[in-house]
Amino acid sequence: MIIAIDGPAASGKGTLGKRLAHHYGYRHLDTGVIYRAVAYALMQSGHDLRDEAAAVAAALELDPEKFGDPALKTQKVGEGASIVSAIPRVREVLVNFQRQFAADPPGAVLDGRDIGTVICPHADVKIFVVADPKVRARRRTMEAKARGEAADEAAVLADIIQRDERDKNRPIAPLKPAPDAYLLDNSQLDIEGGVRAAIDIIEAVRAGRSRG
């Protein structure tokens, strides 16, 4: 089974994906980390984030062992990932990796921005996570402070709004729910509530298929 989870920045899709993968015993891929890794590699090498050739080279040389590097979680790298992900050739290089990950049995949970629309359009379950931008900014600020980083909530909110616009309007794989995706608004839900809501959706889909 393939479970696709999409949504904007700081919507909680990554935590949800991780928890669902643990619940069902599936592998989990936070696809945003892939783009963060490319952005981080460019930053480390001093290249401009819009340098297509350098970005493609970084994408081809990714080391999955480094996906857990805490440096990839910083706000600055996240902003860079949004820029890098808008480069068509970078997306082409990374789409294959994601599809191969999803295809390996027994199942996988992938979260990102175009899983249900581009990467795995035939996923068994598609969930599109949304949350009010102010709620997302508050959560992202708290996460940054928990890591010991300085964070201004107003600045974080402005960045989230800017990233939403960039992700929705990019020419390749814009951020939007798949026609058959289930909408999950977790603005008023804690982590446990969001996980329960997602499991309810998944179980309803599975029950419907078993009856069919």
Swiss-Prot record:
<dbReference type="GO" id="GO:0005524">
    <property type="term" value="F:ATP binding"/>
</dbReference>
<dbReference type="GO" id="GO:0036430">
    <property type="term" value="F:CMP kinase activity"/>
</dbReference>
<dbReference type="Pfam" id="PF02224">
    <property type="entry name" value="Cytidylate_kin"/>
</dbReference>
<dbReference type="InterPro" id="IPR011994">
    <property type="entry name" value="Cytidylate_kinase_dom"/>
</dbReference>
<keyword id="KW-0808">Transferase</keyword>
<dbReference type="InterPro" id="IPR003136">
    <property type="entry name" value="Cytidylate_kin"/>
</dbReference>
<keyword id="KW-0963">Cytoplasm</keyword>
<dbReference type="GO" id="GO:0015949">
    <property type="term" value="P:nucleobase-containing small molecule interconversion"/>
</dbReference>
<dbReference type="GO" id="GO:0036431">
    <property type="term" value="F:dCMP kinase activity"/>
</dbReference>
<dbReference type="GO" id="GO:0004127">
    <property type="term" value="F:(d)CMP kinase activity"/>
</dbReference>
<comment type="similarity">
    <text>Belongs to the cytidylate kinase family. Type 1 subfamily.</text>
</comment>
<keyword id="KW-0547">Nucleotide-binding</keyword>
<keyword id="KW-0067">ATP-binding</keyword>
<keyword id="KW-0418">Kinase</keyword>
<protein>
    <recommendedName>
        <fullName>Cytidylate kinase</fullName>
        <ecNumber>2.7.4.25</ecNumber>
    </recommendedName>
</protein>
<dbReference type="GO" id="GO:0006220">
    <property type="term" value="P:pyrimidine nucleotide metabolic process"/>
</dbReference>
<feature type="binding site">
    <location>
        <begin position="7"/>
        <end position="15"/>
    </location>
    <ligand>
        <name>ATP</name>
    </ligand>
</feature>
<dbReference type="InterPro" id="IPR027417">
    <property type="entry name" value="P-loop_NTPase"/>
</dbReference>
<dbReference type="GO" id="GO:0005829">
    <property type="term" value="C:cytosol"/>
</dbReference>
